[in-house]
Amino acid sequence: MNLPFYIARRYLFSKKNHNAIKIISGISVCGVALATLALVCTLSVFNGFQDMVAGFFTAFDPELKITIREGKVFEPQGAAFQEVRSLPEIGVWTETLEENAMVQYKDRQAMAIIKGVEDNFEELTSIDSLLYGAGEFILHDSIVDYGVLGVELISELGTGLQFVDPLQVYAPKRNVRVNMANPSASFNRDYLFSPGVVFVVNQQKYDARYILTSLSFARNLFNYDTEVSAVELKLKPGADVTAVLRKIARILGDEFVVLDRYEQQADVFRIMEIEKFISYLFLTFILAIACFNVIGSLSMLILDKRED
């Protein structure tokens, strides 16, 4: 049983006074060990980082998202959508409307994405885990509409967590030509109040641009009646996401696109995969060089032990 270890020990370390061979052999072995360790650690870090980023998006993005392939908005009506809505795997169905707008607080302005959502948005995502502040997640009441801003947008506008003055929101009127004599007449203006909370996704894409508000506010601001930009879905526990995605895509046809969480953030995860591959490539190259050093060391050891 110990014979292989005895032979390895005998021929790895020389009793002769050939210190150079000993040093080169030790360096080669250490080089392979360190390169292998670095490769394993780096890939583990990238995998963990990918899971962490996916966790951030999981709290904000839905499990499945239905959008139109061409155009910006659509009406989720008709037999096909009724069939999708009646699928037993569907747990939460939420209609959303996203559009660009300009927001102003006192003398500060910024471009933002207004995302109007239905009241069951809290059931769709884990938005509560992203909220900071003494208030609560509320989109509207019988009097006013509320806007939940990203933490970086709060900083840019200087509103603070609980802003007293309303946030002014401007959006160009649809199908209306700009009135050069009175440009302000070409824009819709509405107001959002603070619910006392902000969301922190730790992703600039959301934290620096998004404002969550009610679907009715977004439709009124952008002159839409029943149109939406997406239908967001949460599946019941135990449902197969891939199988349901394919089923919905088959029902709706080629006119619509159904995306899971990874496909919704395809650019982010694609960049992470590229970084992971490049790191793997470099470390594999270093490991290959270390292996050539081992081969050279073995060649010198063979010459050293040839008399044995």
Tell me what each language-model feature is:
Residues A38, L43-F46, Q50, C291-I302, ...:
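Membrane-embedded alpha-helices of multi-pass transport/permease systems
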Residues K16-G26, P237, V241-I295, L301-D304:
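Peri-transmembrane interface segments
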Residues F46, Q50-A80:
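Membrane-interface junction motifs in transport/secretion proteins
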Residues M1-L37:
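N-terminal Sec/SRP start-transfer signal
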Residues L64-R69, E227-R246:
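A short beta-strand structural signal in non-transmembrane regions
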Residues S86-R209, S216-F222:
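A structural signal for hydrophobic secondary-structure junctions
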Residues V29-T42, T284-L287, C291:
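Single-pass alpha-helical transmembrane signal-anchor segments
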Residues G78-R85, D128, V244-L252:
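Short amphipathic alpha-helices in soluble, non-transmembrane regions
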